């Protein structure tokens, strides 16, 4: 379960503290040449797609947050289209040269939906296309676990204080994240928003197995978007590049 129904401009400010847009863009651009058709599953406020659109890619983004999709459409972007909906429900006859899902979007899906989403994604890819997945390892969750966190995010004369609470459901293997966002705008007005999301705990072997079952072959693994070596002990994020397995090889 996820909400993420708060103004997209606030998410953009918080995202800057967690992500390296330049590294992500360079990584994605290395997977498909300019002019390629790109699909972003879990596109959020469209940050990655706007940058790829500027580089000449033809882009489609899918996100379940109405607030984020509204912001992304207002923000514009050359050659970028946005669809409001869940990744597992997205249907199209178009084929893409690159499909990606970043910022732990894969962890937001229930375990019983993962294989279906990957099988559907396989159908979205062109025969020579590539899939890029970024997800959090099991130990990444364990090491970063804090029951209560207070963080401040600043940008565009806006101050966001994020009060986060984490809890664990061991039976479902999920992390529940509950957040209260206290926002002071540039004009001094203060507003309050609640946000929550569940994250499934995943492991590298589990995701590799699901990819194989869905008809993919893993071609590369990294520990980040600067193509750092993938950690062998399950810490930190894992970035996987996969290609459709030829039918004769299945």
PLM regions with names:
Residues 132-208:
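SAM-dependent methyltransferase
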Residues 42-44:
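Class I SAM-dependent methyltransferase "Motif I" SAM/SAH-binding loop
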Residues 102-103:
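Residues lining the SAM
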Residues 46-89:
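Class I SAM-dependent methyltransferase SAM/SAH-binding core
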Residues 200-250:
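C-terminal lobe and adjacent flexible extensions of AdoMet/dcAdoMet transferase-like proteins
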Residues 115-127:
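A short glycine-rich, Lys/Arg-flanked "PGG" loop and its adjoining helix->strand segment in the class I
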Residues 1-36:
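Conserved class I S-adenosyl-L-methionine
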Residues 91-98:
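A short acidic, Gly/Pro-enriched loop at the edge of an enzyme's catalytic core
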